[in-house]
A protein has these predicted regions:
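Extended non-globular C-terminal regions
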Residues: 205-257
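Catalytic cores of nucleophile-dependent amide-cleaving enzymes
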Residues: 71-135, 139
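Amphipathic alpha-helical scaffolding segments
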Residues: 6, 139-141
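Hydrophobic residues in alpha-helical segments
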Residues: 46, 144-145
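Low-complexity, flexible helical/coil segments
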Residues: 23-32, 89-95, 130-138, 154-162
Length: 257
């Protein structure tokens, strides 16, 4: 299956009508090592030349990652740090388009200590026929080149092949991670369980009186907003690019907490 190979020609020809014409490059990558090397090369190019690529990955895939022509496999977890570096190099403007079954599954690898691996992700949510991938993504790129609107392009793709593709913005991924953390670590029961562990194993260097588990649990509750703000600034690269404080308006008061 080589869907993007068949898309490269039509997309290149359509791109040539614009001035300046966006550069469309097609590179065949046959192994997981070559894929990770390509991501590192793109990050270097973005850093030195200021390029902001749309990265289109096409291969076999499942919920765990991507498989290449030589049958090597790279998990989404192993790919994540390479995408993070590329996203940092593009100042958090990286759009990743995945032509692989379950191509939107990278969101499941994110945790509350991660930076955003991309600005936006487009991928299928089910096993997809090559013909559906080609039709959907051709509609995406045709509309993107014509309108310069990512929103219109995604809508055209979904209209062409319904109930197949999703668009996940970085804000959605942040909320996905935060919601999971709240469900698993910040319920009253979860906080108490953490408090019990903290009471049994107090912080290194603490030699005061024993502290009840309930006190630790209440402290965790009080620190929830502080943790949210640390995660938000780290995820959206606000420490690297202070302007992202205004660019990404997710706040504790308007997030689902």
């Amino acid at each position: 299956m080589n869907v993007y190979g068949s898309l490269a020609g039509p997309v290149q020809s359509r791109a040539q009508v614009f001035r300046p014409a966006p550069e469309v490059l097609y590179e065949r990558v046959e192994s997981s090592d070559s894929c990770l090397a390509l991501l590192a090369r793109l990050a270097k190019m973005a850093t030195t030349q200021g390029n902001v690529p749309i990265l289109h990955l096409e291969c076999h895939g499942n919920e765990d990652g991507l498989q290449f022509a030589d049958e090597s496999f790279v998990s989404w977890l192993d790919m994540k740090p390479h995408l993070i570096q590329l996203n940092i190099a593009t100042r958090m403007n990286l759009l990743v388009v995945v032509s692989a079954c379950e191509g939107s599954s990278i969101a499941a690898t994110l945790g509350p200590v991660d930076r955003a691996p991309l600005h936006g992700l487009i991928g299928p949510t089910r096993v997809v026929l090559p013909s559906d991938l080609e039709a959907g993504y051709l509609a995406l790129y045709e509309t993107l080149l014509r309108t310069r609107s990512a929103r219109d392009a995604v809508q055209a793709m979904i209209a062409k092949v319904p109930e197949t593709f999703v668009y996940r913005a970085a804000e959605w991924m942040f909320q996905h991670v935060w919601d999971h953390y709240q469900r698993t670590h910040e319920t009253p029961e979860a906080r108490l369980a953490r408090g019990i562990r903290m009471a049994r194993n107090p912080p290194a260097g603490y030699d005061g009186v024993a502290i009840d588990a309930e006190v630790f649990a209440d402290l965790l509750r009080q620190k929830n907003r502080e943790f949210f703000d640390r995660f938000r600034r780290h995820f959206f690269l606000c420490d690297l690019y202070p302007e992202h404080e205004e660019r990404f308006t997710v706040r504790y008061d308007n997030a689902e907490v």
